[in-house]
Amino acid sequence: MIKFGTGGWRAVIADEFTKENIRLLMAGLCRLMEKEGLSGAEICVGYDRRFLSKESAHWAAEVLVGYGFHPFVINRSSPTPLMMFSVKKRQEPYGIAVTASHNPAIYNGIKVFTAGGRDADQTVTARIEAEIAQLTPADVRSVDYDEALEKGLITEANPMNEYLDSILAAVDVDAIKKAALRIGFDPMYGVSWSSLSMLLTTCRCDLEVIHDRHDTLFGGKLPAPNVDTLKPLAALVLDKHCDLGIATDGDADRLGVIDNEGQFVSPNKLLVLLYYYLVKYRGWHGPCVRNNSTSHLLDRVAEGLGEKCYEVPVGFKWVSAKMTETDAVIGGESSGGMAVRGHISGKDGIYAAALLVEMLAVTGKSVSELFAEIARQYGDPQWAEADFRMTHDHKAALQERLFVRGETPDFGKAVARICRDDGCKVCFADGSWVICRFSGTEPLLRMAAEADTQDEAERYIRVWRDFLKL
């Protein structure tokens, strides 16, 4: 069954991620576009470095041609933000990226983008699912890829230069050149290996690179930049005396950072740092947006700068929509995805990395020094998180307890409010909070907590875990 989650459709390769299902999904999208009066439109198709991604992109293009659409196929593995940029730049009504982003190597998937290069919202994906439900594999129309290419029914191109030029035009290249920074870079075997390297070397950064070869198994590790997966980058930063360490996830829409002391910088801090820099040092004005599992320190900083912070459900489509509605400066999530006003309407780890490098160059301060400046004014709340793998039956039982019976544990302190709009979030009277919610991309129950002390944040997680018998 094809079911879209918070980050598109993802499934295990050879289980549900099959040629048959890819063709069905694309046929469903084509039928939707036909009903919207878009017959014959150009549609962007891109793919990452995962196993079968290129082949899957070609299967998708074959179906588009079969229904009379004109695929614009990016002819090499590329960052997901490039696909979003292309949809926006070429004014295409839809686009797709074959990727499972930061998921384990056994997964692949498809992200769908709408006009302006936005993540397809729940209304669009529900309509695609409804169209798929009316189809059988025998109903799907297609034209052989090579035949369609020869007849000019498919366009192959690489808009990478346009994308990189748009980022270079948006950052202070001269300041970065003058700073002559040494950067450790870990693309995690993913698609940013050439694009981010080109961007940073154009800015005359001295690069030290690891894990840039094509490996569909991602070195046997999760292609997600976190405190565990970035230990090799931390060692590189210390060994090569780098000013900064940068990593991106498998499809380059998320950013991970190691500071000059070899310490992992949490995505929560990165979001706060970039918002603070853009408002305080660049002089921008406007609110910010975060999801419900992201640090409330962003709220404190926004309030201190005379701005507002908006909370939305998990799923970057909600962040993007609220950013557009409020003309927000930045929007992001605790997993490392962020978007900045004036660029694409979605998360972009490459652009975020460029802004972070500019931040160091312009301020002349390290990441830790700049965050200390923020912490002196707004505090430094502590963070804890944990993931628990779920079976289908276990998930159903927990959903019954959490969202039907509305059960919550006794945390032994005053509760300000409980919100069950997206997961179950308990906010306490002292400003601390804890949330548990089911992942929209993997069979996991995720928990996150924030409090004045690390012990208290971890206690919230333990209380939930014990209450749910995990």
Residue ranges with predicted function:
Residues 7, 45, 83, 96, ...:
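Buried hydrophobic positions in well-ordered alpha/beta secondary-structure cores of metabolic enzymes
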Residues 1-67, 93-94, 148-183:
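An N-terminal, well-structured beta->alpha segment
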Residues 238, 244, 284-470:
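Phosphate-binding and adjacent anionic-ligand microenvironments
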Residues 39-108, 198-258:
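N-terminal small/polar loop signature for handling phosphorylated ligands or for N-terminal nucleophile
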Residues 121, 209-211, 263-282, 349-357:
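Gly/Ser/Thr-rich active-site loops/lids in small-molecule metabolic enzymes
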Residues 108-238:
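Gly/Ser/Thr-enriched, mixed-charge loops and adjacent short helices
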Residues 112-115, 256-260, 340-341:
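Short beta-strand-to-turn element immediately C-terminal to the catalytic PLP-Schiff-base lysine
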Residues 75, 130-163, 260-332, 338-339:
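Proline/glycine-rich low-complexity loops and linkers
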